[in-house]
Amino acid sequence: MELHILEHRVRVLSVARPGLWLYTHPLIKLLFLPRRSRCKFFSLTETPEDYTLMVDEEGFKELPPSEFLQVAEATWLVLNVSSHSGAAVQAAGVTKIARSVIAPLAEHHVSVLMLSTYQTDFILVREQDLSVVIHTLAQEFDIYREVGGEPVPVTRDDFSNGFPRTQHGPSPTVHPIQSPQNRFCVLTLDPETLPAIATTLIDVLFYSHRTPKEAASSSPEPSSITFFAFSLIEGYISIVMDAETQKKFPSDLLLTSSSGELWRMVRIGGQPLGFDECGIVAQIAGPLAAADISAYYISTFNFDHALVPEDGIGSVIEVLQRRQEGLAS
């Protein structure tokens, strides 16, 4: 398998809901006029708490500082796994890289963020951790770093100043999980048809002002949650929204898999997770991989979100609760 270190240098930001008005214009520019901003990595996720942005340096320039904008200190690099094997159908999403990427990085105390899209899964690691990442994964992968759009082979020797942090850290924190009742769909869209849904997209993201129902509370089973994720990365669009929101969009323009599968969410974290703790993604992806359950995974500024097949949500909750009980004991 190949691991590609993409050229994007990404910043992770949070826009507070009361301050969204200040960022509507630059966000619309990034959404609909990417050539003007030269932004090639743009992701916007609405949650009950805030709007999380993952943007490259060109996109970051478009966002003015304000009291409503929080910026994570680190610059993040983007990793992507490609497999050329003609393997039989297997679990998709973060599950397929849980053992080969997520678990080893957690063992070596590398904090990761995940962004699953319709097309692929992006793994974000802090720039300062790159040497550790390469040393950790070089045995498993052929590693390439994109330079000027071309893949250049990378070896351990190229990053000889970093070595795996093999010391045992503290036991992973057991984070509570919630499963809201929404049913979600994962969709894509031909970028040429984006203008046709622009009005609806702007309304849903900026002007609907939906009130989250218990979503930010400590209730173990919130009835529903405000969640909408849009990404435009290297010309490819991915959208995650609940089935009710999808009804607002023209059905002939949004594309999904032939099965039209719906997904349920597992939300990770009772308090904001922060960026320093390692193993949060592994805590979820590992048990799902062991059970061969497909999952999309989207990290945000405060919490993490896994999407699993709707018909398997009961077994997923059972698997994760068993894992939590094991960690807590």
Swiss-Prot record:
Based on x-ray crystallography data, the protein would be constituted of 4 tandem ACT domains instead of the 2 predicted from the sequence. Residues 72-138, 260-321 form the ACT domain. Forms homodimers and heterodimers with CASTOR2. Interacts with the GATOR2 complex which is composed of MIOS, SEC13, SEH1L, WDR24 and WDR59; the interaction is negatively regulated by arginine. Interacts with TM4SF5; the interaction is positively regulated by leucine and is negatively regulated by arginine. Functions as an intracellular arginine sensor within the amino acid-sensing branch of the TORC1 signaling pathway. As a homodimer or a heterodimer with CASTOR2, binds and inhibits the GATOR subcomplex GATOR2 and thereby mTORC1. Binding of arginine to CASTOR1 allosterically disrupts the interaction of CASTOR1-containing dimers with GATOR2 which can in turn activate mTORC1 and the TORC1 signaling pathway. GO terms for biological process: cellular response to L-arginine; negative regulation of TORC1 signaling. The gene is CASTOR1. Phosphorylation at Ser-14 by AKT1, promoting the interaction between CASTOR1 and RNF167. Ubiquitinated by RNF167 via 'Lys-29'-polyubiquitination, leading to its degradation, releasing the GATOR2 complex. Ubiquitination by RNF167 is promoted by phosphorylation at Ser-14 by AKT1. It comes from Pongo abelii (Sumatran orangutan). InterPro entries: ACT-like_dom_sf (IPR045865), CASTOR1_ACT-like (IPR049479), CASTOR1_N (IPR040778), CASTOR_ACT_dom (IPR027795), CASTOR_fam (IPR026249), CASTOR_mTORC1 (IPR051719). Belongs to the GATS family. It comes from the Eukaryota. This is Cytosolic arginine sensor for mTORC1 subunit 1.
